[in-house]
Amino acid sequence: MVKRIVTVFGGSGFVGRHLVRHLAADGATVRIAVRDPEDARYLKIMGEVGQIVPFAADIRNETTLAAAVDGAESVVNLVGILSEWRAQNFANVHTQGAANVAKAAAAADVARLVQISAIGANEKSGARYAQTKAAGEAAIYAEFPNATIIRPSVIFGPEDHFFNFFAGLARFTWVMPVFGCPVIPILKWFTDDAILNIDFYGDGGTKFQPVYVDDVAAAIVSALAAEDAPGKTYELGGPSVYSSVDIMRMLTKIIGRKRLLVPIPFWYLAIWGWLLQKIPAPLLTYDQVKQLEADNVVSEGAKTLADLGVMATPAEAILPGYLSRFKKVGHEAASST
């Protein structure tokens, strides 16, 4: 029996490796379309012999795109970047690249197309990342009206760039940044429990709704099969919303490191982002600061994980398992930190 073929663009990345495992378990032949097939060769062990097929393709090259989707029943586009560098910019990747994939899928009579976007995608956003994600969605629908759009919040999992980054930061500094909080403490006079309370964090700053990478992968597989998914947009978030302060407190508690949480103004972050973005693979960019200015949570009334039959996994159930490597060990544990 010939197995159905699912082409996954960007399948060697963080979400991709989890999606490939889910698709293989679901019985599909997975064609991993990446610029360098060697980057995806390690994923072949996730399936039977011949089930996982690394494939050379570039979303900017129509010839390789056509070959990558030829004979495929479904296509998933995971390709995205967090920062720009030279020709690798948001417009080329998130907008034109997405349009190219959709055009190739339509020309090949592919049955299903799933595009991974992001919560906050909006052409009126102050962040180019969000603007180009929204433009990419529009381009996808123009070429492939029955596409399914998946918008995840911050994705967490063993290889994530969010929690791992801040946990690593906590190993080297006594101060942890929180975003979107009042820079000047709020004085609250004559409250129920004191004459004067000093509020350093306000409402806790920017809000996030982290979603587990395995849940995202399961949702994509479900979207490829669900009869009512074509033409729909889903926003994926975990079961809880956390403020910037909540996240830093949870993270430092998990790794057993007490740290001072300091509100950092966006203007200060923007200066550093502007400076750091001038080097390859920057830790922070100006555009990322603009993204932090907006809450990253599921919109009211949006279709969610539940609509795809996936139960959201709490961050507290997963984070300790892979952040434990950031805990104090040896001489660190014996000293006061």
Where would I find each of the regions flagged by the language model?
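N-terminal Rossmann NAD(P)H-binding glycine-rich loop of SDR-like oxidoreductase domains
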Residues: V2-A28
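Conserved glycine-rich Rossmann-like NAD(P)H-binding loop of the short-chain dehydrogenase/reductase
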Residues: A28-E38
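Oxidoreductase cofactor-interface core, primarily capturing Rossmann-like NAD(P)-dependent enzymes
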Residues: K124-I255
